[in-house]
């Protein structure tokens, strides 16, 4: 397989390239009978789309989604749902100077060796442009999870470069272009990004995403553990170089007496496990953290080679995000939703008749 599909029972296959006529996704396995329209999907696409502030790429794409199949009289039919997003603001000439060279840190070199051909326009299939159909499919998954289980999925940026963003208020996340949960730090982030763009450089970020309301019992040990599938999906997001579940790498310095979340009749005392034990959801919040590397396409001259193997200097003049992490929050939310809906359907298929009434403890201790 070519690695373009995520999920087993709720599977999503994306298609297209950054500068092609359109990009999109085909969802196979969406349960029938759910009301669905473009208006259910568009808000998440609007959160991700480019050109929304001076701190992201200035490529102007409306990212209007079209539902081509799988919906009849406003309801899903259980047949494949095709979602289409047309590209309208390509500038392929911006990439003519890198067609024969390889950008340091980019997929140019590896795509060339794997396929013997590559599309240099905007990175082709390796472009973050291809996260738009993922977000569209994720919006469908979010809706089903919310309506069937009351599950809510929200994300935020917790670090931009070396600036840590203390969590203050979920309500602040939609009020700034950084998805930062802290209004007080936004001016500092803006100043930082303005200087970075002036320097022609880029920077990384850390994104947190949380799912609340997930029932206990989702996940398939051993190799399809819920946390393993979450990590697999998140690593499929452009520029992600690390994934943590719960305490993550902090678990290295914790003792067992500290890390193991104690159970009481009133609930779990902590959530170092990130809502997952033995690959199966505990009923607590599922918490995931992503490390996103700096954008590879920058104006700063970098040493490289051309297709003949000769030395070259690469400068990229296209419209690029100086920090791809700024727009990554809705993408991370979508990926978590896609993994959760797939495991919800898998759990229903195998264990739908299983009912364990006791013990049942709250997700959090009071």
Curated annotation (Swiss-Prot):
Top-rank taxon: Bacteria
Binding annotation for FMN: 125-127, 238-239, 278, 293-297, 319
Gene Ontology cellular-component annotations: cytosol
Taxonomic path: Bacteria, Pseudomonadati, Pseudomonadota, Betaproteobacteria, Burkholderiales
Binding locations of NADP(+): 48, 54
Keyword tags: Amino-acid biosynthesis, Aromatic amino acid biosynthesis, FAD, Flavoprotein, FMN, Lyase, NADP
Family, as annotated: Belongs to the chorismate synthase family.
Subunit comment: Homotetramer.
Catalytic reaction(s) noted: 5-O-(1-carboxyvinyl)-3-phosphoshikimate = chorismate + phosphate
Pathway entry: Metabolic intermediate biosynthesis; chorismate biosynthesis; chorismate from D-erythrose 4-phosphate and phosphoenolpyruvate: step 7/7
Record organism: Ralstonia pickettii (strain 12J)
Pfam families: Chorismate_synt
Purpose of the protein: This reaction introduces a second double bond into the aromatic ring system.
Cofactor remark: Reduced FMN (FMNH(2)).
Gene3D superfamilies: Chorismate synthase AroC
The protein's Enzyme Commission number: 4.2.3.5
Cofactor field: FMNH2
Record PANTHER family: CHORISMATE SYNTHASE
Keyword Amino-acid biosynthesis part of the UniProt annotation: yes
Molecular-function GO terms, alphabetical: chorismate synthase activity; FMN binding
Protein name: Chorismate synthase
Statement: the UniProt record of this protein carries the keyword Iron: no
InterPro entries per record: Chorismate_synth, Chorismate_synth_AroC_sf, Chorismate_synthase_CS
GO term, biological process aspect, one: amino acid biosynthetic process
UniProt signal peptide: none
């Amino acid at each position: 397989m070519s690695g373009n599909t995520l999920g087993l029972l709720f599977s999503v296959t994306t298609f297209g390239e950054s500068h092609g006529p359109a990009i999109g996704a085909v969802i196979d396995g969406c349960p029938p009978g759910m009301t669905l329209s473009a208006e259910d999907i568009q808000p998440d696409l609007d959160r991700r789309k480019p050109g929304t502030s001076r701190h992201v790429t200035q490529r102007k794409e409306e990212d209007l989604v079209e539902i081509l199949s799988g919906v009849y009289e406003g309801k899903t039919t259980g047949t494949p749902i095709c979602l289409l997003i047309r590209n309208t603001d390509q500038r392929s000439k911006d990439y003519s100077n890198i067609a024969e060279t390889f950008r340091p840190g980019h997929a140019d070199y590896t795509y060339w060796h794997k396929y013997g051909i590559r599309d240099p326009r905007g990175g082709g299939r390796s472009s973050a442009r291809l996260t738009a159909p993922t977000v569209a499919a994720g919006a469908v998954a979010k809706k089903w999870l919310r309506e069937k289980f009351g599950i809510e999925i929200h994300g935020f940026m917790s670090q931009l470069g070396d600036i840590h963003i203390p969590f203050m208020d979920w309500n602040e996340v939609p009020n700034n272009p950084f998805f930062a949960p802290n209004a007080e730090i936004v001016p500092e982030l803006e100043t930082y990004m303005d200087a970075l763009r002036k320097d022609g450089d880029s920077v990384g970020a850390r994104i947190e995403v949380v799912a609340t309301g997930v029932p206990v019992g989702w996940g398939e040990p051993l190799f399809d553990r819920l946390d393993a599938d979450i990590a697999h999906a998140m690593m499929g997001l452009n520029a992600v170089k690390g994934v943590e579940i719960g305490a993550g790498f902090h678990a290295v310095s914790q003792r067992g007496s500290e890390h193991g979340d104690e159970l009481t009749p009133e609930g779990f005392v902590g959530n170092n496990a990130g809502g997952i034990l033995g690959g199966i959801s505990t009923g607590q919040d599922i918490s995931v953290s992503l490390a996103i590397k700096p954008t590879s396409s920058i104006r700063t001259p970098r040493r490289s080679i051309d297709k003949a193997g000769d030395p070259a200097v690469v400068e990229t003049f296209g419209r690029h995000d100086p920090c791809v992490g700024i727009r990554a929050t809705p993408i991370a939310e979508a990926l978590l939703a896609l993994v959760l809906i797939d495991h919800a359907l898998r759990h229903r298929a195998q264990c739908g008749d299983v009912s364990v009434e006791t013990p049942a403890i709250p997700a959090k201790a009071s």
